[in-house]
Amino acid sequence: MSAIRLLALILLCTILLGACGRSDLIRVRLLSPIGETKKDHAIYSDLTLVSTSKTTSADPKTSGGSLYFLFKSIGLGLTTLTTQIEKEARTTAGDVLILKEKTTLVTNFTDLAFGIGENYSFMWGAGVLAGGSKLDTSLNYGYNGEPDETLKHKDLSGHSLFLVLGHHGYGFETLLGFRTNYIKAEIEDSGSSAKTLKTAASLNYESTGIRITTNQLQLGIGFTF
């Protein structure tokens, strides 16, 4: 991190701490993602027709939500997010499908949150990946004759960081948040068409050390007691 960014972060934290102060309220907060950072999360790529193919990627889409319970300045939360990732490769001549990848990432996080402020508040924290999380990829191999399949991923792990700004009035809060999720996984590709194509140098992917980072802008409401 550059010196300018570090100074800006220190200044922002100082302003927030000074403006918000300690909270004595009990809060229940609900947040939902309204936007996902545009990024190519594709895991697989075709190697047979690289020079004569075109690739299109749909913007990743995330749904789900977070629920937090804060007692004064500390609280717990649960977050469930589902991110859809799609990428397709076709020939430039004839528009024939070469490879279509559709990945569904389901993440469940247990969050620890800290909060300050009452009329204007600042909440931040971290989450760890919990049970029920999964990463599945559906592959359509197009013209090459290999059967389509869905690959499962194993050894899923990860964590998350988040921050939320809030404005309080008449027992309710309006909330604006940002969340970053870091996911690691390995592919269970034993006996799969993907492994056959990889051995034949027709398909490229990493079976271990897969890393996916997603970022969401969130909006929400809160109730205070």
Q: Where are the language model's segments positioned?
A:
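Cleavable N-terminal export/targeting peptides
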Residues: 1-27
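Short beta-strand-initiation
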Residues: 6-8, 62-64, 160
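Structural signature of transmembrane alpha-helix termini at the membrane-water interface
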Residues: 14-17, 122, 225
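Short glycine/proline- and aromatic-enriched beta-strand/turn motifs that initiate or cap beta-hairpins
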Residues: 19-92, 222-224
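Outer-membrane beta-barrel proteins
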Residues: 37-43, 83-91, 133-139, 183-194
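Flexible coil/linker segments and helix-coil junctions enriched in charged and small residues
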Residues: 45-52, 93-98, 144-145, 194-201
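Gram-negative (and chloroplast) outer-membrane scaffold detector with strong preference
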Residues: 65-172, 212-214, 223
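Predominantly the C-terminal beta-signal and adjacent terminal strand-loop region
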Residues: 155-161, 166-225
